[in-house]
Amino acid sequence: MNTSKTSFALIMVLLFLGTIYSQKRLEYRIPSNLAKGVFVASDDVFEIFIKTTDTKNISVRAEVEGETFETIIIDPVVENGLWLIKLSRSLGFEAIDDKLAAHKVVSIVLHIELPKDKEVWVNSSLASVQARGNYEYINMNLSGGDCKLFDFCGSGIINTLRGAIEVETRNTRVEALTRNGIQKVATRPNGKYHLKLKSVDGNISVSQSQ
C-alpha cells in the first residue's frame, strides 16, 4: 500500500483548559478534492460525530481529555484516496504503570465535517458513531460502540459486535440481521440506496421517511 504524507498545510490548534481534566484540541483541514473520503482507524476513540455540509473542505477536530492528554497526536496521511486518521503517542511517551492505569484514562472524541457524497470508513473496537447527511458510501466496523445514522442518505455496510444500529433514512433497500438482538426494519425493495446491517448482540432499528 502506497502511503504519501500530505504536502498541503495542516491547520493545528491546541487549546489548553485549566480544569481537573485538562483538554487538548487538535484541528486539521484539507481541500475536499484531495481525498474521496475519511478513514478512521483507532481503538482509542470514544465517540465520532460526522456530518455533511456545503463546505469545500474536509475537517477533523479531536477533543482529548485526561491526565496524559498532551501526549496524544494525530498523524494524518492519504492512503488509496482516503484521508487516514490515526492517533498515536508523541515521541518520548512512556506507558504508564498498570497500577496507575485506572487513574490515567484518556477520552478522545472526533468531530468530522465533509462535503456531501464522500466516503466514510471507521474501524474501532471502542467508538460509537453518529452520522448525519448525504454520503457516497459508508463502512463501519464497530465492536462495543453503537452506530446511529440520522437524516441519512447513502449506501454502505455496518457491522457491530455488541452495539446497536439505528438508522433514519429514505428510499433505501435494507438487508439486516442480528443474531441475539431485536430488529425492526423498514425497507424499500426498489430503493435508490442499499444498506447492509449486521450485529451479533445489538438491536437494529430502521425507519424511512417518504
Q: What is each of the regions a protein language model found here?
A:
Residues 121-157:
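Right-handed parallel beta-helix
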